[in-house]
Structure formats: structure tokens, C-alpha cells
Amino acid sequence: MAKSDVKGVNLGMGTGRRKSSVARVYIREGKGDIKINHKNFDVYMQLEKLKTIALSPLALTHTLGKYDIYINVYGGGISGQAGAIRHGIARALFDLDEEYKMVLKSNGFLTRDSRKVERKKFGKKKARKSFQFSKR
């Protein structure tokens, strides 16, 4: 359930994960400031596709610009971090207000994407690719 911060404003928290990235998201009512690792959102996420992925839970719930969001993200690359931020924002929105549960759940934002890189096997070139086979 959502907690209150020092000023008495509702504070939602959520942890999102994707590949090897982890994002801790803190949401509170505000004017729409988004900070990732103490940097502005537009400075940290420069690709438009990744911005769309990261902010999709806010766009879906029509809450873009209503909340101040503070994100601490580490691990992985920018694509995995964008997915982790999306998962974390969805969980934080759900923590803040449970009315969003049906919308977020039906679009798969509350579900952890469990796909990870498959490990390389010995006797193979990569995870599944084999060395060239010669019959003779």
C-alpha cells in the first residue's frame, strides 16, 4: 500500500526487473518531473523508442505529467533498463492506486518478463550454434 512521505504526500514504490537490469521507482504527486539516476529523463533516455517503452504505463493510465518520478536503475544495457523502468513504474502506480490494476495487468505491465540470455554450452560455438560439421 502507498505510504506518505515527510510532507504528507502519497508515495508509491515499485521495483522493476528486465534481463539483468533492476529499477527502483518512487512516485509521488507533482508536476511531472522524471529523474533517472539524478539526471533528467530526456538526457538519460535519448532514443524515442526507449522513452515510449519506459513511459507506456503512464500513457496507458492517462497519468503522464501528474506525478514526479524518481528512478534508480542499474545493470544491463539501455534496452533492459527501459524495460525495468516500465515494470517499476507499473508496480509503483499499482502501489499508489489499486484502481490501475486491471488496466496494467491486462496489458502485461505488472508481469515480469522472464527472458534472459541463454548461457553458452561447452562443445558449442554459442548457446545453440554448433561448430561447422564435416562428414569427411
Swiss-Prot record:
Any one GO MF annotation of this record: structural constituent of ribosome
* GO cellular component terms attached to this protein's record: cytosolic small ribosomal subunit
- Cystine bridges: which residues? none
InterPro entries hit by this protein? Ribosomal_Su5_D2-typ_SF, Ribosomal_uS9, Ribosomal_uS9_bac/plastid, Ribosomal_uS9_CS, Ribsml_uS5_D2-typ_fold_subgr
What is a biological process (GO) this protein takes part in? translation
Question: What's one Pfam family here?
Answer: Ribosomal_S9
SUPFAM superfamilies given for it? Ribosomal protein S5 domain 2-like (SSF54211)
Q: Which Gene3D superfamilies match?
A: 3.30.230.10
Which UniProt keywords are listed?
Answer: Ribonucleoprotein, Ribosomal protein
Q: Which family does it belong to?
A: Belongs to the universal ribosomal protein uS9 family.
Name the chain's protein: Small ribosomal subunit protein uS9
Instruction: Name its species.
Output: Borrelia duttonii (strain Ly)
